């Protein structure tokens, strides 16, 4: 029994010693390897939609097909150097499957210079040439910092695209109106024609009896005259 306890004690000590040596090796190797931290940018970018100023963007926005969404950007530069916004682009992602279905056409802006700790506002319109459904719009701003181009992603916007409202002069709507007009005209004509035929069939009121010449009839067939 004592031999077993002694053997177990030696095994535990050996395991602890091995673990401590491994941890020391890992520490020393991690100290020797210099890890470069990724560079960060310090911008504060927000936006609203001019066509839906009273809408809570966190809940999504509804648009009609072919409608233009005007993004009104607010850009605050918290960097230690001046920057300039030179363009806007982005992409459109379908939901919930997450496929990219369209690109936001890149369009130049300004350039809009923004100094240190300054805020600038600018606008960019996007025409929604999309099918009916739900999508995420992912705007991207093109920024110049120290002569180097940067692409700054902004929080996505959930949008719902609905069919366009039916115009009174829409060809399909006009065809429906013409069809309804023809049906109403046909029904009116049939009613007027039927009413005229019924009027012709009615006997004349207060018609006076017409005297019939019975002189040529035999006496047997003659009606006796009323006294």
Swiss-Prot record:
Q: What is this protein called?
A: Increased recombination centers protein 22
Transmembrane region positions? 173-193
Per the record, ranges on the Lumenal side are 22-172
Which residues fall in a coiled-coil region? none
Please give the residue ranges the record annotates as the region Disordered: 199-227
UniProt main location, coarse: endoplasmic reticulum
Question: Function, please?
Answer: Is probably involved in a pathway contributing to genomic integrity.
User: How is the protein disposed in the membrane?
Assistant: Single-pass type I membrane protein
Cellular compartment(s): Endoplasmic reticulum membrane
Q: Which UniProt keywords apply?
A: Endoplasmic reticulum, Membrane, Signal, Transmembrane, Transmembrane helix
Q: Which ranges does the record list as Cytoplasmic topological domains?
A: 194-227
Superkingdom, natural source? Eukaryota
Task: Extract the signal peptide range.
Answer: 1-21
Q: Which GO terms describe its cellular component?
A: endoplasmic reticulum membrane
The family assignment reads: Belongs to the IRC22 family.
